[in-house]
């Protein structure tokens, strides 16, 4: 049975025909919905030390993050973001719709 998909982040801040801007705010121990990245996106890290990505195959990776860092990410991954650190994790995610 396939897992239901949720949003790529906690809160949609803005949307138009070209972009969707999301906020992902995870307190220590908190996790996101299981989600799929169907669009290319830009991540802007605002706070945190690490965030884990738990995949549907049971594997997990820990990603060290540095506030102020910006990443471009291609679409295709399906995961749950989990904050297993002792500090807040905050990022802004900009999905690029094209056009």
Regions found by a protein language model. Name each.
Residues 3:
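Catalytic phosphate/metal-binding cores of nucleic-acid and nucleotide-processing enzymes, i.e., regions
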Residues 6-33, 40-43, 94:
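A short glycine-rich, His/Asp/Glu-containing loop-to-beta-strand
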Residues 32-34, 52-53, 78-85:
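Short beta-strand His + acidic residue motifs that chelate non-heme Fe in jelly-roll/DSBH
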Residues 36-52:
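Short, conserved beta-strand element in jelly-roll/cupin
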Residues 57-75:
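Short acidic-glycine-tyrosine-enriched beta hairpin
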Residues 75-99:
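Ligand-binding loop in jelly-roll beta-barrel domains
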């Amino acid at each position: 049975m396939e897992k239901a998909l949720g949003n790529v982040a906690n809160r949609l801040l803005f949307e138009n025909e070209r972009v969707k801007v999301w906020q992902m705010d995870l307190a220590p121990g908190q996790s996101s919905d299981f989600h799929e990245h169907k669009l290319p996106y830009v991540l802007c890290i605002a706070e945190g030390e690490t965030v884990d990505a738990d995949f549907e195959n049971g594997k997990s990776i820990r990603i060290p993050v540095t506030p102020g860092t910006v990443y471009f990410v291609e679409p295709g991954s399906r995961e749950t973001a989990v904050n297993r650190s002792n500090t807040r994790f905050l990022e802004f995610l900009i999905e690029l719709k094209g056009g």
